Regions:
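Sec/Tat signal peptide C-region and signal peptidase I cleavage site
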Residues: 49-55
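N-terminal mature ectodomain segment of secretory-pathway/periplasmic proteins
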Residues: 58-140, 221
Length: 287
């Protein structure tokens, strides 16, 4: 294992780190609205660090670019995921809402996603022409014509429908240029282990959110964990997605990218889905 290969100097920047509570999540605009709609409420332990060395910043960017290039080169990808959305109640109690699911991608224009949590059982399919979102337990669905690529779909969901795909930024054709231009601070934090996989641990800061990513070391540098923490709303809300059972190419099971709507399901508009959203209505902020 390479846990000892990282320079001990990288840890000098965090040896005096103090735990602090950041201001937590707000609904963000533009590129981060995708995540804001997923992350909506709170809790995260923020970490204050000393400035990283330039060499560490360059190394972090190189590792992130290698992951971005690797992801872009994969025509077929599938993985399972576990996600946790932290919320804060009006009484200040912090609660985590856990979900699990699957994601199957066929570039440039197909996605099949499932997600099951305590409040929702959702299936989502995009075939390059139409996007269908089915709430199985609520027996409702949305179907919209959205022709184009995965990149165009993510933008459309973000800007028009405010409906995110898990790890949406990581599905884009150029992850590096989705995130890096917004980063005001970049760090290589050394090694970490996620589900037995040794990873490079990177941290980025933008004007509105803090990002952490753990990237598998070796010839398949896929994202093992992705964490988003807000700086702007009291309570430091955090959204975490853990990736497992990563497969590419011929390992990926065949998928029709077709989602038949069951008889009796009610058609809704994209703005009328409180029962199948990741954040259930009982936790929605009061107006």
């Amino acid at each position: 294992m390479a846990l000892l290969k990282k320079s001990p100097n990288r840890w000098h920047a965090i040896k005096n780190a103090e735990e602090r509570m950041s201001d937590a999540i707000k609904m963000l605009s533009g590129r981060w609205k995708t995540w804001a709609s997923v992350v909506a409420l709170t809790t995260a332990a923020g970490v204050t660090m000393m400035p990283a060395a330039h060499a560490d910043e360059a190394a972090a960017k190189a590792l992130f670019k290698a992951m971005s290039d690797y992801l872009a080169a994969q025509k077929a990808i599938s993985f399972d995921f576990d996600s946790n959305l932290e919320v804060v109640t009006t009484e200040g109690q912090k609660i985590g809402l856990a979900s699990s699911g699957t994601l199957n991608v066929n570039r440039p224009d197909k996605i099949h996603m499932t997600r099951t949590g305590g409040f929702a059982d959702v299936e989502f399919v995009f075939d390059g022409k139409t996007v269908t979102l089915l709430g199985k337990n609520a027996k409702v669905y949305v179907q919209e014509e959205v022709p184009g690529t995965i990149d165009q779909l993510v933008d459309e969901l973000r800007n028009k429908f405010q409906r995110p795909v898990p790890a949406a930024d990581l599905l884009m054709s150029d992850v590096y240029n989705q995130i890096m231009p917004l980063a005001t601070n970049t760090k290589d934090l050394g090694s970490g282990v996620i589900r037995g996989v040794e990873c490079d641990h990177l941290a980025f800061r933008t004007e509105e959110v803090d990002l952490q990513i753990w990237i598998a070391q070796g010839s398949n540098p896929y994202p093992c964990r992705y964490v988003i923490t807000s700086q702007k709303v009291a309570g430091s809300p955090q959204y975490t997605i853990d990736v497992r059972s990563w497969k590419t190419g011929a390992e990926v099971a065949a998928d029709r990218f077709n989602l038949p709507v069951p008889a009796g399901a009610k058609k809704l508009t994209a703005n009328d889905l409180p029962d199948i959203d990741e954040l259930p209505a009982i936790f929605a902020a009061k107006k």
